[in-house]
């Protein structure tokens, strides 16, 4: 009898614990709620914005993925990150692929489409939301390659057609008058071929630092090649650099080397006002600007802190909603401007000389923000 009582108590305890566990494991409300297929289809698509980023391992794709993490708001807004080949294919997708509303691309890609491909009405069809961090041209080669000239007639991989490097890298060699044997394969495979001697260099345009390069072990026999900035690159490119701290295993015997960099841009299709697609983009931009502070802290990419929302892109038109949001922010920040102006004057007084071009001004602005953050 006693054993039966104990058994019943144990069974009751197990049932009780199981019931509590079930109560704790609540199915999310968004999954529980049912509706007709038509209603669900409408709800899922009403505020979904497609943004094409780039290669899955690239920084551009991480930017888009982080926008989704920071801005997604159930059925009110959903960012759909789309993987692609890179900056050049992104602009193609923004122009022609169904479901794409925005894309990360580059200023030189836009100019190439406008002047060389002569894409009809590009200036009116594609506008921008904000500038993104610059992307540096990385050229990785075996140690015997000491300059770009050493790659004349050699095999250089630019990544699959459509990547930023397949356009920017090709333009760089063309402008320098260096003919190379162009290879267009994925970069992980190209790295293996570089190590085995089947290709002589790989080119990749991506914001630094990137694990693809920084994780190359020491004594690999590979290094990043110095790219001197000349007048040939003054139109759409700026001076960049790589340091020993960023790539400790790829700058043997050097603390830093030069490279060229190109401006990345968050581009948007200029949908007709009052259309459904325009409303989607409008809501996305409102969320982006209103939650901008979210991107300034970990775990978000540190390059977000380099972005100046007010910075312009020469030759491009800012999307009207972005311009309106920017003006609202500037009005809200008006009380801070006098103090910031005084801070900037103090900062400038400690500089050896005034900036000579846009690249120097942007660099000075970043340093000013860092200096200001330390003071306040």
Model-derived features: where do they sit?
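Pocket-lining segment of extracytoplasmic ligand-binding domains
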Residues: 107-108, 117, 178-276
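Hydrophobic/proline-rich hinge and linker segments of small-molecule sensing/allosteric domains
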Residues: 30-34, 127-146
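Short beta-strand-to-loop elements that line the ligand-binding cleft
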Residues: 77-86, 179-187
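Pocket-flanking alpha-helical
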Residues: 65-69, 80-121, 191-193, 210-216
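Bacterial N-terminal signal peptides
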Residues: 8-18
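Ligand-binding clefts/hinges and TM-proximal coupling segments of bilobed small-molecule sensing domains
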Residues: 26, 161-172, 240-314
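An extracytoplasmic/periplasmic, membrane-proximal ligand-sensing/linker region
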Residues: 189, 195, 206-220, 224, ...
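Bilobed "Venus flytrap"/periplasmic-binding protein-like clamshell domains
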Residues: 48-71, 135-192, 196
């Amino acid at each position: 009898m006693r054993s039966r009582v104990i058994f019943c108590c144990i069974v009751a305890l197990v049932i009780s614990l199981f019931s509590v566990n079930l109560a704790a494991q609540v199915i999310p409300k968004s999954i529980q709620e049912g509706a007709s297929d038509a209603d669900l289809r409408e709800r899922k698509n009403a505020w979904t914005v497609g943004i094409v980023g780039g290669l899955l391992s690239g920084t551009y794709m991480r930017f888009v993925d982080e926008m989704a993490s920071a801005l997604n708001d159930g059925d009110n807004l959903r960012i759909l990150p789309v993987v692609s080949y890179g900056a050049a294919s992104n602009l193609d997708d923004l122009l022609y692929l169904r479901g794409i509303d925005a894309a990360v691309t580059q200023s030189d890609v836009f100019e190439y489409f406008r002047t060389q491909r002569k894409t009809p009405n590009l200036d009116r069809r594609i506008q921008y939301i904000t500038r993104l961090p610059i992307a540096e041209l990385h050229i990785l080669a075996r140690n015997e390659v000491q300059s770009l000239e050493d790659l004349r007639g050699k095999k250089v991989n630019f990544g699959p057609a459509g990547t930023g490097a397949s356009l920017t890298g090709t333009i760089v060699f063309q402008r320098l008058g260096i003919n190379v044997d162009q290879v267009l394969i994925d970069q992980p495979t190209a790295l293996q071929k570089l190590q085995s001697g089947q290709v002589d260099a790989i080119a990749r345009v991506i914001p630094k630092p990137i694990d693809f390069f920084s994780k190359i072990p020491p004594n690999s026999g590979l290094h990043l090649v110095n790219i001197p900035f000349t007048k040939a690159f003054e139109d759409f490119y700026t001076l960049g650099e790589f340091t020993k701290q960023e790539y400790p295993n790829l700058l043997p015997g050097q603390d830093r080397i030069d490279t060229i960099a190109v401006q990345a841009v968050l581009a948007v299709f200029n949908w007709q006002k009052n259309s459904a697609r325009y409303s989607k983009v409008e809501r996305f931009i409102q969320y982006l600007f209103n939650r901008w502070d979210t991107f300034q802290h970990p775990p978000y990419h540190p390059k977000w802190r380099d972005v100046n929302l007010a910075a312009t892109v020469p030759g491009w038109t800012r999307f009207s909603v972005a311009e309106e949001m920017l003006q609202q922010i500037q009005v809200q920040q008006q009380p801070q401007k006098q103090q910031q102006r005084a801070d900037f004057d103090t900062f400038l007084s400690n500089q050896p000389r005034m900036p000579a071009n846009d690249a120097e001004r942007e660099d000075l602005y970043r340093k000013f923000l860092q200096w200001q953050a330390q003071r306040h």
